[in-house]
Amino acid sequence: QKVEGLRHRQRLAGEEIAKKGRAKEDTTALKAEMKTVSEDIRSLEAELASVETALSNLMLMLPNIPHDSVPRGDASANRVVRKVGEPRPLGFEPKLHGDLGAALGILDFERAAKISGARFATLWGAGARLERALIQFMLDLHTKERGYLEIIPPYLVLPETLLGTGNLPKFEGDLFKTGTSDRELYLIPTAEVPLTCLHRDEILDAGELPKKFVAFTPCFRSEAGSHGKDVRGLIRQHQFHKVELVKLSPPEQSMDELEGMVSDAEEVLKRLELPYQVVLLASGDMGFGSTKTY
């Protein structure tokens, strides 16, 4: 308000100086006053910019508001919504997937570490074909039967893209950052980032919604906060492949669209005849940008 008041005074003084100039009246004192006003405005604008930046940074650190249906609490308050199928009794002690993959010669961590360091893997032969087949199966299911539009997005994104999805500034430590002489880019942690921002800064007609996108991409995460967590096998890798579903919808339809998206994901597990459970995460176990998560 103070800055606007000084700017208003400056505009009025400019008109007064012009008027006095036409009347051949002395404007020395008024010009001297306006010089002081201009200096005050510059000083206040710098202070205002600093305060606005600090306020913006604080607001960017605020998480999304949990939906009323979300249980309050930490991970112990997570709620099992439903269970589908039962695990088959194997009659023997199963191996960890990492050990099994290594024994079959389709998964190799040691050679990946030689190439890239820890938390990378190479898939060999049938392992590579299996992953490729699963990816194609999911893409075909979602595009041909569930109405999603397949997108191949960029794997490198601008900082403002990650700002728009809530990854920056809070989770910068979890991202891989690249730098060139002309710009700063980040490797995507999930296809959700570029898909969500496809229509950023656009006004969409309600009749176009919902928009349903599916994308297969590699994902890159530093997993800086995973110390002490299970990192065996293919868990918490720096690079992994994922088929992502994203919907853009009006806020009043978002919960229905979420339930539909959960159903779409469940269909994959049903057709693969894998037993599973759907868990509603508690507020303390949800992601920073989520209002409701299964």
Q: Where in the sequence are the language-model features?
A:
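TRNA-recognition modules of translation machinery and tRNA-sensing kinases, especially anticodon-binding
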Residues: 83-294
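N-terminal alpha-helical targeting/anchoring segments
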Residues: 1-88
